[in-house]
Amino acid sequence: MGCDGGTIPKRHELVKGPKKVEKVDKDAELVAQWNYCTLSQEILRRPIVACELGRLYNKDAVIEFLLDKSAEKALGKAASHIKSIKNVTELKLSDNPAWEGDKGNTKGDKHDDLQRARFICPVVGLEMNGRHRFCFLRCCGCVFSERALKEIKAEVCHTCGAAFQEDDVIVLNGTNEDVDVLKARMEERRLRAKLEKKTKKPKAAESVSKPDVSEEAPGPSKVKTGKPEETSLDSREKKNNLAPKSAATNESFSGKAGKPLCGATKRSIADSEESEAYKSLFTTHSSAKRSKEESAHWVTHTSYCF
């Protein structure tokens, strides 16, 4: 009845039963959620961002995901709700002074404390390792524990002083119920943003059409008194009266080229009190004037000789 060696097998060793459900190690799950990027599965390194559902990402991984235009994106379901870089918020994290990182166990002869976290709450001092609920503000990106938010009730951020609303508080790595609530808020927020854009478009079109109307009639409108026909006739008569005056002034100013306006400026050298030797240098002197008999007919002369 027994096998070799006197062993007796039992029924469950011979007959295959239903498979047992494998239980996920909670500690390993918490380490994966709080220390690794949800998109690239790499260790979180600054700058660290969070989406509207409370998941942690490396900013470089999110940018690469958005730039990737291929049809098949690796782990696309984890970030399918991220359409642009505006859908994530860069987190302002407070370092844990007790965390040594990789320097504490360089030789491999020490126990790694997985519960030791890199970041802590700046208000209460709790470590951000998954044992305590943490949240961040979408308006400023500051991260602190949920206990600090409940104990110190205020409408202002505890670290930077920025004002926030209840809708801005997002739980990091929350439960399935928390994710459902955050997803409903996200969809409502995006729908509201679309409606605001639609309402802004007709206003922008009106603002563009208003300058066209103003170009036709710029400046304030002036009320004209009296009949328009009379005013137009008066203006024509004034123009006709001014026309001859302007022509006369133009003729007086144009005149002969080179003639001075005042007669006092033109004077003869003969009237001056200079010596006769000086006066003989000019053509107006009596010695320069010759009669037709004295001048030869074949000699070229100018008008100054007469």
From Swiss-Prot:
Sites of Phosphoserine modification: S287
Chain intervals with Basic and acidic residues compositional bias: 226-240
Residue ranges, annotated region (Disordered): 193-276
Keywords for this protein: Chromosome, Phosphoprotein
Entry's Gene Ontology cellular component terms: nucleus; replication fork
Main location: nucleus
Pfam families hit by this protein: Rtf2
PTM info: Undergoes proteasomal degradation, via DDI1 and DDI2. Removal from stalled replisomes and degradation are required for genome stability.
Keyword Phosphoprotein tagged: yes
Domain of life: Eukaryota
Any single biological process term in GO: regulation of DNA stability
CDD domains per record: RING-like_Rtf2 (cd16653)
UniProt GO molecular function: DNA binding
Matching InterPro entries: Rtf2, Rtf2_RING-finger
Localization: Chromosome
Function: Replication termination factor which is a component of the elongating replisome. Required for ATR pathway signaling upon DNA damage and has a positive activity during DNA replication. Might function to facilitate fork pausing at replication fork barriers like the rDNA. May be globally required to stimulate ATR signaling after the fork stalls or encounters a lesion. Interacts with nascent DNA.
Subunit structure: Interacts with DDI2; probably also interacts with DDI1.
Family: Belongs to the rtf2 family.
Protein name as annotated: Replication termination factor 2
Organism: Macaca fascicularis
Gene name for this UniProt entry: RTF2
